[in-house]
Amino acid sequence: MKRTSTTLTIASGKGGVGKSVVAVNLAETLTRRGHSVALLDADVGQGACSVLLNEDPPHTVADLVRLDAAPDAVCHETTAGVTLIQSARAPDAFVTEQQATVLHLSLDEMLRTAQHHHDFVLIDTPAGTGGTVRWALDRADLGALVLVGEPTAIADAYRLAKLIWRTDPTFPLGSIVNFAETAEEAKSIAARFATITERFVHQAPTHLGWIPFMKAVRTSVQTQTPAVRSVPAVQEAFDALAGVVAEGRHHERQPINTP
């Protein structure tokens, strides 16, 4: 029997906002709450999820493209029980339009496999508005835009939000504020961003949650151990975020842009 799966795409307008850290910690938190979770790292050649988890998947989606591995072999179970799917290791893989199309077809195959066996599939995208980002958002039931308070990051996030809503005005987009000192600061950043999007595209993302700015999070990146395993304040933040995501599960969306 097919599971009722929810696909959440985690995106950002620019790099350096902690998107992959959010994806990894949220995946482990949902798993700890009893959900089966797959984490698809769609950042071709520059994916950080395996590094942050200190895992070394033997196969990637690129191996599936080359017929060197079956879909089940590409699914790697981490020590925390998350199914990790890595797109490709080589940064110069799938750079042409034709190669990207082939990759997206294989990503679709892996996504269907993950959706069939898991309650949640989290897709960690590259930063920006490229083709793989659009592919991942188009396949999602819900999008989560990672925000930080820097003006350039807000501007880049706005460009991505504008692209999303001009493509699909009904797309369910939420925001996660990262690197915030307090809940009040996080709410202020989310509200400021919502004011911008409401003014120019007449839409506003739902504020899903926030992650505190802590030295322990930076340390967890260096030690390749997700902070939710040992830092209570981070555990609390991600547990609240996971609760919002789990309670707000959306019905299946139909893709409207097939590359």
Spans of model-derived segments:
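P-loop/Walker-type NTP enzyme "switch/lid" segment
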Residues: 39-116, 215-223
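NTP-binding/hydrolysis catalytic cores, primarily Walker-type P-loop NTPases
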Residues: 222-259
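Phosphate-binding P-loop
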Residues: 1-5
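Beta-strand-loop-alpha "switch" segments that mediate conformational coupling across diverse proteins
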Residues: 199-227
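Conserved catalytic-core segment of NTP-binding enzymes
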Residues: 120-209
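Short, hinge-like loop/turn segments at secondary-structure boundaries
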Residues: 55-59, 163-164, 190-194, 226-228
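Walker A/P-loop NTP-binding active-site region of P-loop NTPases
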Residues: 6-71, 120-122
